[in-house]
Amino acid sequence: SKGIIEKCMETNPKAMVGYGPDGGYPEGFGYWGYGTSFQVMLIAALESAFGTDNGLSQAPGFKKSARFMQYMTAPSGDCFCFSDSPVEAECNMMMFWFAGKEKDLSLLWIERQYLDRPDMQFAEDRLLPSLMVFCSQLDLNRIGKPKKNFWFNRGDTPVFIYRGGWDSKKDTYLGVKGGSPSTSHAHMDAGSFIFERDGVRWAMDLGMQSYITLESKGVDLWNMSQNGQRWEVFRLSNVAHNTLTINGERHLVESNAPITRTFESKKQKGAEV
């Protein structure tokens, strides 16, 4: 076991590079929940057993990524579903760990809404028991709403978010992303956006398609080369996204679209890609 732990401490930092430099998670909402749950459980186990995580939680952008995750949920309750993410957002138990770690209960503003909904069920979440541990020192009656309405991260998948508020399903929401189709689990969606207002998602992303529905039909889903079959799947292609398509051609897999400018004033809100 000593050798396994030592090997883990040596190699795990390589997996945490994706959170840098400022908290954006390149694979989007769905895989933040998947990958970060394992990362948090590792850190929590190390801290419980040894009193330290040897600096893993200090990796650039890691703790900031909880705020990224929060901004990914729109006022409608659905998420900004770029890359292989489902449209439906869900409660993530790891957010409670981050709230305790950062001593910032505002990180739980949206998670609390999930807990208060009588139609939400969590029994199938394999990490549900961790909620009791992570919440043991938190006063969930003192959760305040976030203070900011803008999010912007750089990194492999730059993302800009504007929320008109945190109180109503009718609040305005704009999500813009850059990046590259070559990123893990990416779609050809660089330059795309979603937009909500008055409780309606006026500009949408179709989100991921179930892997089993494609792989069971023999689709070579993980060939991400320029001519790979992955890009024949409609909802993964650029023509299915709110972005530019020229002469019906695919985006270049090896291309990259940075967010070069953001607008965060009362008169102008948005991003240039």
Question: Which positions does each model-derived feature cover?
Answer:
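Active-site lining segments of carbohydrate-active enzymes
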Residues: 1-30, 131-147
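Conserved aromatic-histidine-acidic binding/catalytic patches
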Residues: 23-31, 54-57, 232
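Carbohydrate-active enzyme catalytic cores, enriched for enzymes
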Residues: 34-202, 260-272
